[in-house]
Amino acid sequence: MNKSIIIILLITVLDAIGIGLIMPVLPTLLNEFVSENSLATHYGVLLALYATMQVIFAPILGRLSDKYGRKPILLFSLLGAALDYLLMAFSTTLWMLYIGRIIAGITGATGAVCASAMSDVTPAKNRTRYFGFLGGVFGVGLIIGPMLGGLLGDISAHMPFIFAAISHSILLILSLLFFRETQKREALVANRTPENQTASNTVTVFFKKSLYFWLATYFIIQLIGQIPATIWVLFTQYRFDWNTTSIGMSLAVLGVLHIFFQAIVAGKLAQKWGEKTTIMISMSIDMMGCLLLAWIGHVWVILPALICLAAGGMGQPALQGYLSKSVDDNAQGKLQGTLVSLTNITGIIGPLLFAFIYSYSVAYWDGLLWLMGAILYAMLLITAYFHQRKTTPKAVISTP
């Protein structure tokens, strides 16, 4: 594995750690500036600000990396993140925290750049495998982040921010020394020509060759993935009367299984049967998991359901791999930025929508949301089957 890939994976895991690192201590830090009555409001606004900045700036950073190269954008993001965490560590007013979260959302929107860099350095046949690695290490970071934040938060509410600033600074130096620009020179030159810098070109790049269907599929898969993320705690407490320990253990098992399927299994399936077949398999398995959780009330169903939900995560790297092979090198940043934005949008609307539906449906049937997820998958599978019959195996697009 070359040094650039290692740096890409390190940046990805550090971004994921950063998401969860401050969660345990942010309320404590807010207590220094706001009253108890307004704490929850400010906490929610800060989280929403971060997510909103990710939605806005992921495609922007992706496009900038197409134009100027992956390395400058990654170095800028790491430097900005290090300075931002220092700002938050030594904040003396509430507005400094708000500015810090805005900057964190901007500089943390590097998922598109990392995915673009990964597509630059990996052969097309192996992209699903390496996108699976990205998803796997991101999952590791999401597990480590809250644990580390809790441990460091016991020392001081400011300590997680100091740790994040130091770790980003170290990775900045490593990237400066060992990360080589991954984008081909001809792609950089092409993206700097006047005709490639028009607003219409940016907007129309994905209108070609029917990639809309697969972008919509990606969005719906990510949206369905917000169902367990939103209601798992409430659902298991209501149906199985679980305590926090049991819930925490089940989430840990789901996290480990998710990493396994994304980092190891997805790539092997894609190499053997292709990305589209892997996508169909993952949707079918995830649909089975949703049906199990919708109808079966025995606790023994949890393990097979968790396996199904985790295996359903293979659809994301497989779709990334397929879409990445379907665009030219000089459009990778735009593509990956679009995918990251779609993911972040589902992370905003999914919890709001599904929490609302669950709160009103639980009194009648607590399995309604799982059934809705299964129905969405069934509709996707049927639509995908007919879509594949009408389209050619590969739709190559280019930036005019």
UniProtKB/Swiss-Prot annotation:
Keywords: Antibiotic resistance, Antiport, Cell inner membrane, Cell membrane, Hydrogen ion transport, Ion transport, Membrane, Plasmid, Transmembrane, Transmembrane helix, Transport. It comes from the Bacteria. Coiled coil: none annotated. One of its GO terms (molecular function) is antiporter activity. Pfam families: MFS_1 (PF07690). Its main location: membrane. It is found in: Cell inner membrane. It is a multi-pass membrane protein. InterPro entries: MFS, MFS_dom, MFS_trans_sf, Sugar_transporter_CS, Tet-R_TetA/multi-R_MdtG-like. The chain crosses the membrane at residues 5-25, 42-62, 72-92, 94-114, 131-151, 159-179, 215-235, 247-267, 291-311, 337-357, 362-382. GO terms for cellular component: plasma membrane. GO terms for biological process: proton transmembrane transport; response to antibiotic. Resistance to tetracycline by an active tetracycline efflux. This is an energy-dependent process that decreases the accumulation of the antibiotic in whole cells. This protein functions as a metal-tetracycline/H(+) antiporter. Belongs to the major facilitator superfamily. TCR/Tet family. This is Tetracycline resistance protein, class H. The lineage of its organism: Bacteria, Pseudomonadati, Pseudomonadota, Gammaproteobacteria, Pasteurellales. The gene is tetA.
